[in-house]
Amino acid sequence: RPSSVPDRTARNPTTATAPLAFFERAVAFGAEHDILIAHDAAYSENTFDGYRAPSILQVDGAAEVAVEFFSLSKAFNMTGWRVGFVAGNASALKALSLVKDNTDNGTLRAVQCAAAKALDAADTLLPAVNAVYQKRRDLVCNALADAGWPTAKPQATIYVWAPVPEKFRGDSGAFAEALLDQAGVVVTP
């Protein structure tokens, strides 16, 4: 039987979001089966159009059965600095701390100081960063729609997903090659 269940919303990289009711069910499941729920909330702060991603830790009882991982990479333009934090179940955090203490030397102090400054300025920084991401999202989605390839505008994350055109269904590699050859655009098949 599993000892933990991972979950990701806003999903990296699918852009899917979940309502608080989803987390309520996850917490109830974790409590019923004595399973730790590990929620990857790396993109939870990158939201658009008034949407705010809920936290699993908003749910009553979540601190007993869940941990939530956060990253400053995209929300604060700190990609590559590998800085984040985790909150939730105290015994899980203690175990994670023990593992972390014995597997690496921690995060460079300068990066920790930059992260602290970013978090202190979150009310100013996050709207500015998200405005840039939203503008990029809108440019991509509008350009795709103008090309006859409409896509849904995601409420969260930095990704845009578009269906592979009908003539390339079943061969995303051929589509990626055609897009590179004909438009100079690189995508992952």
Task: Give the label of every model feature segment.
Residues 1-189:
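PLP-dependent class I/II
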